[in-house]
Amino acid sequence: MFKGGMGNMMKQAQQMQERMQQAQEEVANMEVTGEAGAGLVKITMLGNHNVKRVSIDPSLMEDDQEMLEDLIAAATNDAVRRVEETSKERMSEITGGMGLPPGFKMPF
């Protein structure tokens, strides 16, 4: 009886690992856009934190450089935050039924 239960548990762990790997691939390929200055600066970032695109409203090109630099940094930080949130949500969808404690990281 124990062997059947253990075998079933191992099978579930393997399925979980496969779902986690698939979710990690999905997250790495997703795109999120961070914004600053009411959308005047936008940073599109992939789930692996690589910046794909930077969009700057032409009206900002006439303003001072320091403000533009601040907006780019803020938009980048917003994009990073959105990647982290989306990744966390996706992973919790998979591990939701496992009853894992908050912050627990899977070994795979």
Swiss-Prot record:
Start and end residues of each stretch annotated as Disordered: 1-26, 88-108
InterPro entries assigned: YbaB-like_sf, YbaB/EbfC
Keyword Iron (UniProt): no
Pfam annotation, one family: YbaB_DNA_bd
GO cellular component: bacterial nucleoid; cytosol
Superkingdom assignment: Bacteria
Signal sequence extent: none
Protein localization: Cytoplasm, Nucleoid
Binding partners and assembly: Homodimer.
HAMAP family listed in its UniProt record: DNA_YbaB_EbfC (MF_00274)
Similarity comment: family membership: Belongs to the YbaB/EbfC family.
Free-text function comment from the UniProt entry: Binds to DNA and alters its conformation. May be involved in regulation of gene expression, nucleoid organization and DNA protection.
NCBIfam families: DNA_YbaB_EbfC (TIGR00103)
Protein name per Swiss-Prot or TrEMBL: Nucleoid-associated protein IL1848
